[in-house]
Amino acid sequence: MLEIFDVSYNDLTERRSEDLYKLRKITFKDRLDWAVNCSNDMEFDEFDNSGTRYMLGIYDNQLVCSVRFIDLRLPNMITHTFQHLFGDVKLPEGDYIESSRFFVDKNRAKALLGSRYPISYVLFLSMINYARHHGHTGIYTIVSRAMLTIAKRSGWEIEVIKEGFVSENEPIYLLRLPIDCHNQHLLAKRIRDQSESNIAALCQWPMSLTVTPEQV
């Protein structure tokens, strides 16, 4: 089973946090070459703190994917790291969250789930399920052009709030991610058509999804 659930920073075990930060280093530094802070072969920053929650996707006791959530009223990447690009955007009041450090470990996902399993779409849907379960109003995030393309392809009716440039040829985008029933079911139906899971299982939180890996 693919288990997707959330855990607080304080409740992360040492083994799990080390694995998480090492996979983030592989994704964001080694593969994407982002300007991120790394130490001891791990990637973490000032937003990995007691106000943070992580969404983890685990299969066969191995971490496959993750997202980081922070209350939008707390210091986060939108209001601090990229304040020079998006500081003129008036963010809404209310129970919104910011998501960041979205990743799927491609090697583990392919080996454990198979190359055709729609793990990115499942992770998008899990973000909606998490936010709805915890009573949040919506999600804001900053993404690269590549991630924007993947999100649009999923059918999620995201809203681009503003484009900014971290360098001359490197745009990033501030997005509002809707979490209403309509978008939840759009993604659930897309995933159902590409997997063994039914709509009810896909819209639960936490999530427990049957996956039959491809036969090689």
Swiss-Prot record:
Reactions that this protein is recorded to catalyse:
a fatty acyl-[ACP] + S-adenosyl-L-methionine = an N-acyl-L-homoserine lactone + S-methyl-5'-thioadenosine + holo-[ACP] + H(+)
- Domain of life, per UniProt, equals Bacteria
Tagged with keyword Cell division? no
Q: Which SUPFAM superfamilies match?
A: Acyl-CoA N-acyltransferases (Nat)
What does the record give as EC number? 2.3.1.184
What the entry lists under Pfam families is as follows: Autoind_synth
Q: Which Gene3D superfamilies match?
A: 3.40.630.30
Enzyme type, top EC level: transferase
Q: Which GO terms describe its molecular function?
A: N-acyl homoserine lactone synthase activity
List, in alphabetical order, the GO biological process terms annotated in this UniProt record: quorum sensing; signal transduction
Q: Which UniProt keywords are present, listed alphabetically? A: Autoinducer synthesis, Quorum sensing, S-adenosyl-L-methionine, Transferase
- What family does the entry list? Belongs to the autoinducer synthase family.
Q: What is the protein's known function?
A: Required for the synthesis of OHHL (N-(3-oxohexanoyl)-L-homoserine lactone), an autoinducer molecule which binds to a yet uncharacterized transcriptional regulator.
The molecule here is called Acyl-homoserine-lactone synthase
